[in-house]
Amino acid sequence: MSKFVLVKIETMSKEVYIVAAVRTPMGAFMGGLSTVPATELGAIAIKGALERSGVKPELVNEVFMGNVLQAGVGQAPAAQAALGAGLPNTVPCTTVNKVCASGMKSVMLGAQTIIAGDNEIVVAGGMENMSLTPHYVDGRNGTKFGNITMLDGITKDGLLDVYSKVPMGTCAEACAKEYNITREDQDNFAITSYKRAAAAWDAGKYDNEIVPVSVPQRKGDPIVISKDEEYTNVHLDKIPGLRPAFDKEGTITAANASTLNDGASALILASKEAVEKHGLKPIAKIVSYADAAQDPLWFTTAPSKAVPIALAKAGMTTKDVDFWELNQAFSVVGLANTQILGLDPEKVDVNGGAVALGHPLGSSGSRILVTLINVLKQNNAKIGGAGICNGGGGASAMIIENC
């Protein structure tokens, strides 16, 4: 792991506040949002965040948006989303690809520009439409004879370890063996995630973070999608009977892994000066953040490396954090990192996680920040921590404070 400097953000020249944090619902694969391009989902999230914050589009200094599966999306996806949300064409935009951590890294980059004094107000988040990801054909030189092989863009650019050529699920199997996490453990974790997600939706705990998406239809009125779709697409009693997906003797199944999804999320970041100047209302403050990396095959436990760095920068320990959001790329990821970090499972992903809600790659890192802010508000809590792994062996983490 690389060396790091323990510097608290609040001791720097700029404090970074979050003045809005929203997301679209997450659509099931080939579901209700499958026809809405990632950049349109991003635009909807950005527009919703701007409206929620009261920030006028012309006040935004820069935009960072995560997007992983970019083939066919078109040039400069972040700019497409920004312009679609009504931002001026003079606002610089950058698209970030750190696989599943893209959305969180976008927020980190946005915060850094504010701390450096380059910006006062930044839009940051992520977006993905996995349903629209194309298949690839290597036909540049033509095919003289024989069949043409097509590659799945989702697998090629999102779910395959580029070094060992094995799927992410194979890495998850190795993690389960290393930490003695059984199939039953993972199935129970998944069932808990689904139950928590359903209970949270029934109690209206997700309502405050959602920006509905109006989906045009060939005939008739548009259909408005205002709820996550994935958590209802399950029969809990069938989970224990599913076959392993990556190893016939393995423990990872379609049910205890996250799903393929479509969605976007966006946060509005502002300096203390901007908050005071424009009369903005902070909902959270960024206390610290960190990245970490290790062997790509062990991306599954990389959050357990990034989280301690973020905590050290904040001058905190795990005991100082009231609630956590850890990405549930697989149930084993949540279980392993909770175990390694010594966290209380009752304080982690309390409203369900990606196994039940969905995991649109470019949005996942910023989505858990959106949810974490709302969890802190719902429980009148102060400190929240978030961690997310990413393919290639990396992870990002962030500590926030409720305002």
Regions found by a protein language model. Name each.
Residues 121-174:
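Flexible glycine-/small-residue-enriched beta->alpha junction loops
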Residues 171-173, 209, 217, 287-356:
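Active-site pocket-lining segment
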Residues 9-36, 234-301, 305, 370-371, ...:
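Condensing-enzyme catalytic core mediating Claisen C-C bond formation in acyl metabolism
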Residues 24-50, 69-71, 94-108, 120, ...:
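Active-site pocket-shaping loop/turn-to-helix segments
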Residues 48-61, 175-180, 275-279, 308-323, ...:
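Phosphate/pyrophosphate-binding loops at sites that engage ATP/ADP/AMP, CoA/4′-phosphopantetheine
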Residues 67-121, 151, 162-167, 233-259, ...:
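Conserved catalytic cysteine-centered active-site region
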Residues 96-128, 176-205, 266-273, 338, ...:
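Active-site-proximal alpha-helical scaffold in enzymes
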